[in-house]
Swiss-Prot record:
Glycans are attached at N5. Belongs to the G-protein coupled receptor 1 family. This is Olfactory receptor 52E8. InterPro entries: GPCR_Rhodpsn, GPCR_Rhodpsn_7TM, Olfact_rcpt, OR51/52/56-like. Keywords: Disulfide bond, G-protein coupled receptor, Glycoprotein, Membrane, Olfaction, Receptor, Sensory transduction, Transducer, Transmembrane, Transmembrane helix. Odorant receptor. One of its GO terms (cellular component) is plasma membrane. The gene is OR52E8. It is found in: Membrane.
Length: 313
């Protein structure tokens, strides 16, 4: 009897449908996802290796970049392998516990990415607005403290989601029309009130919006400082140091912003568009970030070229 009740309260598994409406082309959709994952793995691993081995990159900016690379490896690995399983091998079933774990890591790494981008904006603000005090402010101790705060805040945002879902009874269908498990997608399957889940989810969105506001404020101060510089050459040089970070911010927040808008207001938009946009903001940034920094950062570019030249010889 207890086993039956437990099964009714928490289903043994869920079914992830992938991208509803595009099932016939799942196998082809999986191809770009596979290459994106390959770029994310190779690119972020290469950047971590270069930052570790290149003495000139042992600076606060690159320590934050190493954090971002580690997060991107985690985020891409938490999402894409399961997607490829759905697209190529039709492995749509995922256990209840597996789905919660899947959700935890996706939301955790997403929250981490957001706050690390704030830390990187703070780094650029100090570098441009207080250059003489840069190494005095961003000491190893402060960087470790920022990393600790990023982890703790992300846990604060995500751990309660697990318990909010565990308290819910699931007595309806167990089909999730998505490529991965996410909080509200699971909560909507419950046959009880999910008001607390919605409120906590809105609280998390508010924290992410706060991150965006902090980044904007940092760049307002940066732009003010830049345009106070005496020459255009100095201004362009200062702005160039922010180019990679701005590219990474846009790669992360732009798909997330459009995904939120279509989910909130695009009721007439086909469901597969919602799912594709939701995939973009967890899949694309981990692949784009190493490309953006690799192309725009001279030390990284030269170090990678030296590695390839040694390999060829």
């Amino acid at each position: 009897m207890s086993t039956s009740n437990h099964t009714q309260f928490h289903p043994s598994s869920f079914l992830l449908l992938g991208i509803p409406g595009l099932e016939d082309v799942h196998i082809w959709i999986g191809v770009p996802f596979f290459f994106v994952y390959l770029v994310a793995l190779l690119g972020n691993t290469a950047l971590l290796f270069v930052i570790q081995t290149e003495q000139s990159l042992h600076e606060p900016m690159y320590y934050f970049l190493a954090m971002l690379d580690s997060i991107d490896l985690g985020l891409s690995t938490a999402t894409i392998p399961k997607m490829l399983g759905i697209f190529w091998f039709n492995t749509k079933e995922i256990s209840f516990g597996g789905c919660l774990s899947h959700m935890f890591f996706i939301h955790f790494f997403t929250a981490m990415e957001s706050i690390v981008l704030v830390a990187m904006a703070f780094d650029r603000y100090i570098a441009i607005c207080k250059p003489l005090r840069y190494t005095m402010i961003l000491t190893s101790k402060i960087i470790s403290l920022i990393a600790g705060i990023a982890v703790l805040r992300s846990l604060y945002m995500v751990v309660p989601l697990v318990f909010l879902l565990l308290r819910l009874p699931f007595c309806g269908h167990r089909i999730i029309p998505h490529t991965y498990c996410e909080h509200m997608g699971i909560a909507r399957l419950a046959c009880a009130s999910i008001k607390v889940n919605i409120r906590f989810g809105l609280g998390n969105i508010s924290l992410l919006l706060l991150d965006v506001i902090l980044i904007i404020l940092s760049y307002v101060r940066i732009l003010y400082a830049v345009f106070c510089l005496p020459s255009w050459e100095a201004r362009l040089k200062a702005l160039n140091t922010c180019g990679s970070h701005i590219g990474v911010i846009l790669a992360f927040f732009t798909p997330a912003f459009f995904s939120f808008l279509t989910h909130r207001f695009g009721h007439n938009i086909p469901q597969y568009i919602h799912i594709i946009l939701a995939n973009l903001y967890v899949v694309v940034p981990p692949a784009l970030n190493p490309v953006i920094y690799g192309v725009r950062t001279k030390q990284i570019r030269e170090r990678v070229l030296r590695i390839f030249l040694k390999t060829n010889h």
